[in-house]
Regions:
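Alpha-helical repeat scaffolds
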Residues: 78-84, 111-122, 156-169, 199-212, ...
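Internal alpha-solenoid helical repeat scaffolds
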Residues: 88-264
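Short, well-ordered secondary-structure microsegments
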Residues: 39-101, 105, 418-433
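Conserved small/polar residues in nucleotide/adenosyl-binding loops
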Residues: 435-437
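Short capping/hinge segments at domain boundaries that bridge a core fold to an adjacent linker or tail
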Residues: 1-32, 55-56
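Structural motif corresponding to the intra-repeat A-B loop/turn of tetratricopeptide repeats
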Residues: 39, 52, 72, 107, ...
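Alpha-solenoid helical repeat architecture
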Residues: 42-46, 54-55, 93, 130-140, ...
Length: 437
């Protein structure tokens, strides 16, 4: 009954507000937006300013938040705002343009990203009075953002990072170290293992390039190279090395507030604990409760994906978090770079549930995504999963063919763990497949 009265009062208040003069409504929306922004509630601030059509205020909030919470909105909402926002207003906010360029990349809205870059460069060109230092900072930060178009070619990205570092005299404004570095992926290695047979070179490149990136971004993603080293060691069966690299990464990121990188460590620790006798990881319920208190849905999804993967491997399907157990990934906003990883983990859940035909049916589209983003490790794992699914359905020729492809891709880098993790389903095939490599 109390809810009904509350709803009636809310409707009455909304009707009374709608009857106010337009200028008065805009003034109130501006006051709401200012209060929310002052208290760090940027999504509410954006909503209020948009209702009041205060485009300058919206753009300032996006800059203040560095676009972190834009991930909670749909691309369509943000694109509609950009279409409505006057060009001159956009051009007056060059730092916001940089933030928006990065967000367009994560949504794979590349034409819009390039359109915003052109607007930024035109704005810089139109203001010759701009101090040289600020001009160089804007152009350098533009190089930094454009490096994402070379994702996940580590060397190509690093060339643009070094170009940016040569220009910039301040840290980047458009990237905050509390924001997600992995775009929501639970694994660094899944993001950056690009070419079978080149894992060693990729690890060397990551160790060489990250210090330049850290200097530009106040340490955003700190520990990424150590996590990637640890993951590579884990997949190669070098468990002691994996544990050492993991603890080095944890020491690096301790106390720096980068929950994203800590969650990648957590995923690695949980996989390692399935292989060797180590201290038990923190119980999922405890960790999840701590994450809930942070009110960040991306962190929760990363953690849920790690728990779902490990529970699926061990057949503990009742322990799989609801997002994956209910196969509800399609209901949430995922950034494009992390989608193949999340879909691969959902595949592992389907396999644990015995939905083998579903795994096979999904594999072609998922492998196409992996090819588009050069995700060699995710593709390897999808082929292994699909091979196990074919084997479970008695389709041995198809299973052996896919397993052979996976073994040929994994052998040059000595990647063993993905096969071991699916050992129950692959064991009858492995001996025959090894003969035919």
């Amino acid at each position: 009954m109390s809810y009904r009265f509350h709803h009636m009062m809310k409707v009455c208040a909304e009707q009374a507000f709608a009857a106010l003069p337009e200028q008065t409504r805009r003034a109130y929306h501006g006051r709401y937006g200012a209060w929310y922004a002052a208290h760090g509630q940027y999504l509410h601030a954006l909503a209020a300013y948009r209702k009041g059509e205060d485009y300058d205020a919206v753009l300032q909030v996006i800059q203040d938040d560095a676009g972190i919470l834009l991930a909670a909105l749909s691309p369509e909402e943000v694109l509609a705002f950009l279409d409505a926002c006057p060009r001159d207003t956009l051009q007056a906010h060059p730092l916001t343009l940089l933030v928006l360029m990065r967000r367009m990349f994560t949504w794979q809205q590349i034409p819009k990203m390039l359109e915003l870059r052109a607007l930024l460069l035109a704005g810089i060109e139109a203001h010759p009075e701009l101090p040289d230092a600020e001009r160089d900072n804007l152009l350098g930060e533009c190089d930094l953002i454009m490096s994402f178009l070379q994702y996940n070619d580590i060397a190509a990205m690093s060339r643009l990072h070094r170009s940016a570092a040569a220009r910039m005299t301040r840290p980047a404004i458009s990237i905050r170290n509390e924001g997600s570095w992995t775009f929501g992926s639970p694994s660094v290695l899944m993001m950056f293992h690009r070419t079978p047979g080149q894992l060693g070179a990729e690890l060397d490149a990551m160790n060489a390039c990250m210090p330049h990136y850290y200097r530009l971004t106040n340490g955003h993603g700190q520990g990424a190279e150590q996590i990637m080293d640890a993951e590579a060691a884990l997949l190669q069966g070098r468990f002691a090395d994996a544990a050492i690299f993991l603890e080095c990464a944890r020491a690096t990121i301790a106390g720096n507030g980068q929950e994203n990188m800590a969650l990648c460590c957590d995923f690695l620790e949980r996989r390692l604990a399935l292989c060797v006798d180590t201290a038990a990881p923190e119980p999922p319920a405890h960790k999840r409760a701590a994450l809930l208190a942070q009110h960040d849905t991306m962190w929760l999804r990363i953690f849920d994906s790690a728990c779902a993967y490990c529970a699926a491997l061990t057949g503990q399907t009742e322990q799989i978090p609801a997002l994956f157990r209910d196969h509800a990934l399609h209901t949430v906003h995922l950034l494009a770079p992390c989608r193949p990883m999340m879909e691969m983990i959902e595949n592992q859940v389907y396999l644990a549930e015995g939905a083998c035909a579903r795994v096979i049916g999904r594999s072609e589209g998922l492998l196409a995504q992996c090819a588009q983003q050069h995700y060699a490790l995710v593709a390897l794992q999808v082929r292994i999963q699909t091979s196990a699914a074919y084997a479970a359905l008695g389709k041995r020729p198809e299973a052996r063919s896919l397993l052979g492809q996976a073994l040929r891709a994994a052998a040059p880098d000595g990647l063993l763990l993905p096969f071991a993790e699916n050992g129950r389903g692959l064991r009858p095939l492995l001996e025959l497949s090894l003969i035919h490599i």
